[in-house]
Every structure is written in C-alpha cells, then in structure tokens.
Swiss-Prot record:
Annotated keywords: Nodulation, Plasmid
General function of this protein: Responsible for the nodulation efficiency and competitive ability of strain GR4 on alfalfa roots.
Domain of life per record: Bacteria
Name used for this protein in its record: Protein nfe1
Family: To the N-terminal of nitrogenase iron protein (NifH). Has lost the ATP-binding site.
Amino acid sequence: MAALRQVAFYGKGGIGNSKRKPELVTASIEDRSAGSPSKNKMHFQSRMNVAASMRGGDGLPPSVRCRLHLEDGTTRGERKERTRLAATFQSVSEERPRLHMPRRVTTTHTTLFVTFVGFTTPIVPSTVWSISRSNHLKQSN
C-alpha cells in the first residue's frame, strides 16, 4: 500500500480574500506525482482507464507533433527548415525602391532653356525635383 502523506494546500477564501492557513489533506504519493509511473498496479490501471476514456483510445495518445506529417512523409521540423531556407535568400534578391537616397548627378544631360518675359533660365534635369518629392517637402515643413 502506498504511503500516506500530509500535504498542505493554500487556498483562497473567496474573491479578494487571501487565506494563508494551510489545509491539511491526506494524499498518496501516486496522486501527487502525475507524470511518474505508479508502483501500485491497481492505481496505475485506474489512471490508464481514465486516460483511455477521456481520449477515446487505449492509454495515453501519442504526441500531436509525432503525428504531423505531410503526404510526402516529411515531418514538421523538415518543413520548417525548408521554409527557413527559402526565406533566407528571398530578401537578398528583391528589388527595393530608391527611397532616402541622394540624387544622382548624370553626366549626360541636356540643358533646357525656358524663356520668360525679359529673361531666359536654364533648367538642368538632374537638379529638378519631381512633383511627388516637392509635395513631400511641403508636407514635412
């Protein structure tokens, strides 16, 4: 027969009322060690019957991760590794927009001359701001 022990449980006496008085309960070693196998055969059989009735199978079911396989037979870890390798080189080869880069001065440009009443102004394309850039500058100021 399993040895009986006195176990102290600290409980609450209600919502917000914390009671620190220990409540002595007699519990066997098998009842307190849920993960270890029981030395008492009747107690072990009782635990297996409870597990079988809860899960609908014989004893404890296999782990969920052990059952996760694709149709081709690969496991969850192999799928994660394959996805990780595919994502590694994806960001390297992507084309990124040219944001926050200084304007590049082109050496081959044509100078446009705009004539107003009384004077002529040269316009170099490498120094002209685009419309979207000028709108962005107006909003930030």
